[in-house]
UniProtKB/Swiss-Prot annotation:
It comes from the Bacteria. Signal peptide: none annotated. It comes from Brachyspira hyodysenteriae (strain ATCC 49526 / WA1). GO terms for cellular component: cytosol. Keywords: ATP-binding, Glutamine amidotransferase, GMP biosynthesis, Ligase, Nucleotide-binding, Purine biosynthesis. It is an enzyme of class 6 (ligase). Gene3D superfamilies: 3.30.300.10, 3.40.50.880, HUPs. Residues 198-389 form the GMPS ATP-PPase domain. Catalyzes the synthesis of GMP from XMP. It holds the Pfam family GMP_synt_C. The gene is guaA. This is GMP synthase [glutamine-hydrolyzing]. Homodimer. The active site is at C84 (nucleophile), H171, E173.
Amino acid sequence: MQNNIDKVLILDFGSQFTQLITRRIRELNVYSEIHPFHVSIDFIKEFKPKAIILSGGPSSVYEEDAPKVDKQLFELGMPILGICYGMQIIVYSMGGKVESADKREYGKAEIEITNHESIFKSFGKSNIVWMSHGDSIKSIPEGFELIAKTPNTELAAIENKQKNIYAIQFHPEVVHTENGIKIIENFLFNICKCERNWNMGSFIEYEIKRIRETVGDKNVILGLSGGVDSSVAAVLIEKAIGKQLKCIFVNNGLLRKDEDKKVVEVFRDNFNIDLIYVDASKRFLDKLAGVTDPEQKRKVIGHEFVSVFNDEAKKIENVGFLAQGTLYPDVIESVSLRGSSAVIKSHHNVGGLPKDMKFELLEPFRELFKDEVREIGLELKLPEDIVYRQPFPGPGLAVRILGDITEERVKILQEADDIVVSEIKKAGLYRKLWQSFAILLPVKSVGVMGDGRTYEQVCAVRAVESVDAMTADWAKIDYNVLGIISNRIINEVKGINRVVYDISSKPPATIEWE
């Protein structure tokens, strides 16, 4: 990462909201990174953070195996903000007392602010916050003073101005906390004196230079899928090394309608990228014949992709690097509480490449979130319909065709899915929804068309709202829009005579049907 920008170090104790803290800070144009709570003091000194934040977590600090920090952390002179468990670890480590609460506090609560300086600067007398804790602080360490309380939590926020340590028993990073961003702003800019010097324009400049220095005269191969991450990576890397980038686009016969044509048009024709297009649709469909089990479908597709990709990669000379669109959440997921030695997850398409293909990985986005990658895509003039494209499963339409996969059933689903996406866009809903798509079911139903009886396939429509795909709510789409989608599919797609709408949330259902 660039050395000339201010950085915030977030020590992770296992909170479900830790990534949200990072995102909130980056939205304020300050760079932040998450690392496990047990990183060494030497690592912290070398990282040179402008501020340190201790995240929440599910543990109780007084338990023997609870995550702890080196007490030297509090003597470094760096500003520290503890959130929820982070507050409790500060109190416990510095001589205060934490016990199981008589009354747990979950959900919204009203804090009374007793000190309107530091993190509560420009606040009113009270504020609604989001609590999530089963332990409470009974006494605070020497040098700390109370700055906020609730009816159930006498010590809801404390500070030690001399040591520049602040701690709060609630979550400012969640939307349920009113003025939560203001608390983070006060900490970053009034207390830590951070500069707003993290932006995608400077990242692009830095990364182009880094890619050139890293790659040298070697060629780079990238599996282009047409999705957001690989598309933006392709354009950024091409900007750095030009024709040294070789993109391999495999048509597995399970893509969205006309997707192969669109990918070739955008990347080969508009961006002049060296694109190798492989039509392996027959090969994939032959291998999938008679396969109905979802996991088996994934295995067959994964194996075939690796085989096709390998065949094409071997034809390219002087390859030194394999580029992937790995994102920061993948990295966090792999290294957080388990320690930095954990293996980083690989992209599903290339994770199984043979070991004799000794390429180094080139991952330009491994420190970025999806919204930051989209911002880069816009800066690089990628079409908005690619930048804001909804997530699409790696195995493609194979996991949206329940039962047998045939060329005919793929074409039926492509047409139905194209209608769903088209009408969702017309209604102005596409960017508001996490995903919206059609599923072809392995059942037929009786219908009537004109004077005749029909016995054709059933199509389900799925649309969900989500932030991170970990949880999702089914979208309450206007009945008129659903009616148009249903009528168009039944009238325009030969082979479907009934459309149903999926009203399942995640959990208990998953977003995809398989």
